[in-house]
Amino acid sequence: MQRSIFTLALLSTLALAAVPAAAAVDFGAEVVSRYVWRGTDVGNAISIQPGMSYNFSSVEIGAWSSWAINGGSANENNLYVSFTTGPVAIAITDYYFPAFTANDRFFRYGDGDAVHILEASASLARVDMPISLICAFNFSGDTENSFWIEGTYDLGEMDETAVSVTVGAGNGSYTTDTDPNLVSVGINLGKADYFASYILNPDKESTFLIFGKNF
């Protein structure tokens, strides 16, 4: 079933020659000084992060990846499907971590190989409210079935720079002892195509200052 879902997603994305007039496609990339994901430095290197998406009505199918420039460390190549109704979005994401070995073939799924992690998530974001929320749960590929919850508060603009604060907590693979804990507190700035974040992980007692640019 899992394999069928994402095979269908791939076929739908590749069928762009028959895109209806109401549909839209998009692509882009980011370059970041470090790839910090939910309070953890994933690659310990500058990373290039391309993405592409196909939107039709309330459905979006897309791919997003992160590639470290230090010779293949912490590569990630994800697929996702999302459905949005009003301020609520429901998504399934396939996190795939290719290391280019015989044990990380794309169609290997399950809790035992750790090459794919499948996540279900729900998010809430209203244009008339400064707060957005996301809850996520790993239902395959993660023996801990880790749970994540995150909130972002938009503080508005200062000197033409968007300012927000993000707080995230999780358990399982997100924490040092698998128990629920606060693992990410960040201050985020964005101006034009540039962005920066200062992130504290209270659980690991580590901090990061990252900078990036959108293309």
Please annotate each region the language model reported:
Residues A22-F215:
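Outer-membrane beta-barrel proteins
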Residues M1-D26:
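Cleavable N-terminal export/targeting peptides
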